[in-house]
Amino acid sequence: MGLSDGEWQLVLNVWGKVEADVAGHGQEVLIRLFKGHPETLEKFDKFKHLKSEDEMKASEDLKKHGNTVLTALGGILKKKGHHEAELTPLAQSHATKHKIPVKYLEFISEAIIQVLQSKHPGDFGADAQGAMSKALELFRNDMAAKYKELGFQG
């Protein structure tokens, strides 16, 4: 389920918009994730105490983590599917240390798509959305395969 060169170009074009404000996009993605799927918040000791959207928006730690998440994802997307070296340590930490289920990767993928739709409607039409969905699915499938190798049934 690889992407065509044209699809990767659509993904990387919109990702260029994200890179203009990685921390802001990342914060918004995490807030959307936590609001839409409150159970995901339980995996983050640093953020468990944040109950309202205002508290989340005011949290520098949340913004920093959003920056970390989207910086890592951007590095993976830029590899256009050849992301083994980037994925291995990420899968290792998410499977063994953080115990993040694959389902939560689906949830954050949805949040990423929603944030891109709301922040960049002109650059994120149906074709770009389809391409990004495929790229995120490729990422999730490869993470799930690594999880399996590590014996994590997330």
Curated annotation (Swiss-Prot):
Residues 2-148 form the Globin domain. PROSITE patterns: GLOBIN. It is found in: Cytoplasm, Sarcoplasm. The keyword Flavoprotein does not apply. Nitrite binds at residue 65. Keywords: Cytoplasm, Heme, Iron, Metal-binding, Muscle protein, Oxidoreductase, Oxygen transport, Phosphoprotein, Transport. InterPro entries: Globin, Globin-like_sf, Myoglobin. Belongs to the globin family. Monomeric heme protein which primary function is to store oxygen and facilitate its diffusion within muscle tissues. Reversibly binds oxygen through a pentacoordinated heme iron and enables its timely and efficient release as needed during periods of heightened demand. Depending on the oxidative conditions of tissues and cells, and in addition to its ability to bind oxygen, it also has a nitrite reductase activity whereby it regulates the production of bioactive nitric oxide. This is Myoglobin.
